[in-house]
UniProtKB/Swiss-Prot annotation:
Belongs to the EPSP synthase family. MurA subfamily. InterPro entries: Enolpyruvate_Tfrase_dom (IPR001986), Enolpyruvate_Tfrase_sf (IPR036968), MurA_subfamily (IPR050068), RNA3'P_cycl/enolpyr_Trfase_a/b (IPR013792), UDP_GlcNAc_COvinyl_MurA (IPR005750). The modification 2-(S-cysteinyl)pyruvic acid O-phosphothioketal is found at residue 118. GO terms for biological process: cell division; cell wall organization; peptidoglycan biosynthetic process; regulation of cell shape; UDP-N-acetylgalactosamine biosynthetic process. It is an enzyme of class 2 (transferase). The active site is at residue 118. This is UDP-N-acetylglucosamine 1-carboxyvinyltransferase. Its EC number is 2.5.1.7.
Length: 421
């Protein structure tokens, strides 16, 4: 099993290109199931999760071709041969559940295994089921699979979600594009990935309004056609690499970065003593003189502070001056990186959904273990500024969400290498 060796060194300087958004691409790919015409995605990230979604779509009979070194995905669902998403593929990645809505809308039936992915809490499917049932779907759980059918087709409805779930919003919006009549989704998630999905669906002929707000209205159409769509910049990769110069010092330009994707995160960086400036090519990040200042962080749905940057932010605050409090309100059990950071000398106390971080002057390198995708990169960031060597094991998580992480950090001066296991 591979590991990554990080040696603490000085400031980082240079440029890092930001890839297309993993979470957007994993939503856009199942949209091909809604049409019998080709869908092409450009600016696709090159990640293991994308390969998993490719295998899933191919198992349903879709054609998926990876072009231009994986940056372009050409897909066609002209001849679907199955409506069953098997456990062997779905167990590897939670986003597999996003084939449920599209298959139900186009085929009138779908059988989807309960999903897998990172071990960060229950993350139930209840909200997805409630949303699709509101459109007239009949869904039951048998033998670990969701069996869904809509023999008379889906019908538009007004539905208010109990929680602004990103995945449930995506599933319902895709399903509603082919439903009869008008669907109004209230308390919808507002994430940029949903805005990107709607832009793609609109290019395919869908009639949708309100993306980026808490109320989305979809007027169902008889069919969708093909389209070409550019995947939005990955705001989580962007935020992650913004933290590299914040932790190590120096000045790094993030190519393709956009402030509107990371607003609440940038506010916390500013409060901690980090400067972020827009450039012609993206965003430039540098740390003001001295140690960063402690800040309190509460994770919230967009446009609040993203849960997917909480672990990386904790790595920064481990060496802040003062005491920081991080409150996790999106997922349970998402402080599994805290004990590993403690092995490096961090002072962290976790009580339920709250972590208290008392800053120390410097962390010390140590062998640590990645427990999930974002935890793995937080340990790498911590190691960049730690004294000595940090060996991060179980980095297979990393390949699910970051392309060429070693090369990108090396390019700005980090001392980092991947060790094959």
């Amino acid at each position: 099993m591979d590991s990554i060796l990080v040696t603490g060194n000085g400031p980082l300087n240079g440029q890092i290109p930001i890839a297309g958004a993993k979470n957007a691409c994993l939503t856009l790919m199942p949209a091909t199931l809604l049409s019998d015409e080709p869908l092409t995605l450009t600016n696709a990230p090159r990640l293991s999760d994308i390969k998993t979604m490719t295998l899933l779509l191919q198992s349903l009979g879709a054609e998926v071709s990876s072009l231009q070194d994986g940056k372009v995905l050409a897909m066609s669902s002209h001849d679907l041969t199955s409506h069953t998403a098997d456990y062997d593929i779905v167990r590897k990645m939670r986003a597999s559940n996003l084939v449920l809505g599209p298959m139900l809308a186009r085929l009138g039936q779908a059988v989807v295994s309960l999903p897998g992915g990172c071990a960060i809490g229950a993350r139930p499917m209840d909200l997805h089921i409630e949303a699709l049932e509101a459109l007239g779907a009949e869904i039951e759980l048998r033998d670990g699979y969701l069996h869904a059918k809509a023999p008379g087709g889906l019908k538009g409805a007004v539905h208010e979600m109990r929680f602004a779930s990103v995945g449930a919003t995506e599933n319902m919006v895709m399903a509603a594009t082919l439903a009869k009549g008008t669907t109004v989704l209230k308390n919808a998630a507002r994430e940029p990935e949903i805005v990107d999905l709607v832009r793609c669906l609109r290019a395919m002929g869908a009639q949708i309004e309100g993306e980026g707000t808490s109320t989305i209205e979809i007027q169902g159409v008889d069919r969708l056609h093909g389209a070409t769509h550019q995947v939005v910049t990955d705001r989580i990769e962007l935020g992650t690499y913004m933290l590299a110069p914040a932790i190590c010092g120096g000045e790094v330009e993030l190519l393709g970065g956009r402030l509107d994707l990371v607003g609440a995160f940038v506010e916390k960086l500013d409060a901690a003593g980090i400067d972020v400036a827009e450039t012609d090519k993206g965003l430039k990040v540098s740390r003001r003189n001295g140690r960063v200042s402690a800040v309190n962080v509460t994770t919230e749905p967009f446009p609040g502070f993203p849960t997917d940057l909480q672990a990386q932010m904790m790595a920064l605050l481990c060496t802040a001056e003062g005491t920081s409090v991080l409150e996790e309100k999106i997922f349970e059990n998402r402080f599994m990186h805290a004990p590993e950071l403690t092995r490096m000398g961090a002072r962290i106390e976790v009580h339920g959904g709250t972590a208290t971080v008392r800053g120390v002057e410097r962390l010390k390198g140590a062998p640590v273990m990645a427990t999930d995708l974002r935890a793995s990169v937080s340990l790498i960031l911590a190691g960049l500024a730690a004294e000595g060597e940090t060996l991060v094991s179980r980095v297979y998580h990393l390949d699910r969400g970051y392309e060429h992480v070693v090369q990108k950090l090396e390019a700005v001066g980090a001392r980092i290498e991947r060790i094959k296991g």
